A protein has these predicted regions:
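Short loop/turn motifs at secondary-structure junctions
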Residues: 1-2, 23
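C-terminal output/effector regions of signal-responsive regulators
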Residues: 52-163
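Short gly/pro/ser/thr-enriched loop/turn and capping motifs at secondary-structure boundaries
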Residues: 14-15, 36
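Receiver (REC) domain switch/output surface
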Residues: 21-23, 36-49
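Nucleotide/phosphate-binding catalytic cleft detector across ATP-hydrolyzing
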Residues: 18
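A short, hydrophobic beta-strand element within the central beta-sheet of small alpha/beta folds
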Residues: 2-13, 28
Length: 163
């Protein structure tokens, strides 16, 4: 974890030795202000959360690209966001995307749940025609090709994220 260590010491020579390390976020020489340490910890947490969010979203989009989803479609963006929201919620079993997670995505993008659902279905239809049969069979472990439902796509990608 680069830039995630805060050093507090009364020994100036020790602080000088570690100051340029990639792992040091900030150094404090005693006496110090606790408010500054608290602010530094909050900044580290925010930066790490942002990096984790960016990494997860990148992995989701990578999986969608494998399936030949077209990112010019709004539905692809909504599907990606829906998968991210489920991942973030730590829900292991989602019964109804339309009732549980589409409203979250709809609120974020200021759209109706029906618009989110329709755009996701449109993106899936386009993906189904753009993606090779072989890729669909391998990815979804199908013996024959059928158009996947949104929930199937969500679960498969979540399983890949959880490893």
């Amino acid at each position: 974890y680069r830039s995630s260590i805060i050093v507090v010491s009364g020994d100036y020579s020790m602080i000088r030795q570690v100051y340029n390390s990639d792992y040091i976020y900030r150094c404090f020489l005693k006496p110090f202000n606790f408010n500054e340490i608290e602010e530094s910890i909050e900044k580290i947490i925010c930066e790490n959360n942002y990096e984790m969010e960016t990494d997860v979203k990148s992995k989701i989009n990578k999986e969608l690209k494998k399936l030949k989803f077209n990112f010019t479609y709004k539905g692809t963006k909504y599907l990606s966001e829906c998968i991210y929201q489920i991942y973030k919620s730590n829900e292991s079993d989602v019964d109804n995307l339309s009732k549980e997670f589409y409203p979250i995505v709809a609120e974020k993008y200021n759209k109706s749940v029906n618009t989110i659902y329709g755009n996701i279905k449109q993106a899936i239809n386009a993906m189904f025609f753009d993606c090779e049969e072989r890729i669909l069979k391998e990815y979804f472990k199908y013996s024959f090709v059928v158009k996947p439902k949104p929930k199937e796509i969500v679960y498969i990608i979540l399983n890949k994220l959880y490893g």
